[in-house]
Amino acid sequence: MTTAHRPQFDPARGHSEMAPTRITSSRALPAHLKLKYRQESQGTEEEVRKQDLREALLRAEAAHFATQEHGASSEEVSQNSKLIEGFTSPSTDDKPNNDVEVDYQELLRQTLEADEDASDSDDSVDSSNKNSEVSIKRRKTESNSQESVDSSNSESSDEESDSEDETQQLLRELENIKQERKREQMLQEEKNRALEQEKREREIAFGNELLNKASSGSFQVKRRWDEDVVFRNTHKGVDDTPRPGFVNDMLRSEFHKKFLARFVD
């Protein structure tokens, strides 16, 4: 009997290897052993600190407004760019530059006014075109409505008389249909009530088996519960006499029994 299933008081523990030599693949070795730092022109902290984000934003805004201006001349765009280029941030220079003074509010106001003038001109052209189209459409609709009124006045009298006759006829037909449906519904309800009453009377008369002994006969079970099974009465017609067979015992064999019956009284 095995004892592998029994718990051990001293479980197996790993031991030091006697031959620690191993062959390690180069792919299993660590690839990067030193921490890498950002080099110049790779977005170091000093470079980010020296960037003038305000100047870049103003350049981008000026370029955008210059492209949006429809009637802006090249002189105005160049003047705006020169004003932006002349700006120097106080963080980069130790002394403020008094020679070049830029009014950024004035610059933004000029660009916004130019943009608004262009949009107003476009809106005025569009509104004038729309007004002309609306006036033409209004004239056409007025002429068509006048013609339709003249023709409808002549036909309205005939149509009113015909429509009144048709509505009266339709109302009469609708009333007849409602009456027929109501009669059919009443007949169906009476028929259903008669059937339910007949069914109820039959259940009352023949529903109780104890009161209907004559009709039901006796309460004896006519069929057995295992009458329709597959292997029922399989032992019928089978010979119960023992068949001669081989017995591994000379004293109980058929030959020994016959021998004793013949020679021994």
Curated annotation (Swiss-Prot):
Keyword flag Protein biosynthesis: no
Basic and acidic residues: bias regions: 172-197
UniProt name for this protein: Pre-mRNA-splicing factor cwf15
Family annotation (PANTHER family): CELL CYCLE CONTROL PROTEIN CWF15, SPLICEOSOME-ASSOCIATED PROTEIN CWC15 HOMOLOG
Annotated GO biological process: mRNA cis splicing, via spliceosome; mRNA splicing, via spliceosome
Disordered: annotated span: 1-31, 62-197
Gene that encodes it: cwf15
Source organism phylogeny: Eukaryota, Fungi, Dikarya, Ascomycota, Taphrinomycotina
GO terms of molecular function: RNA binding
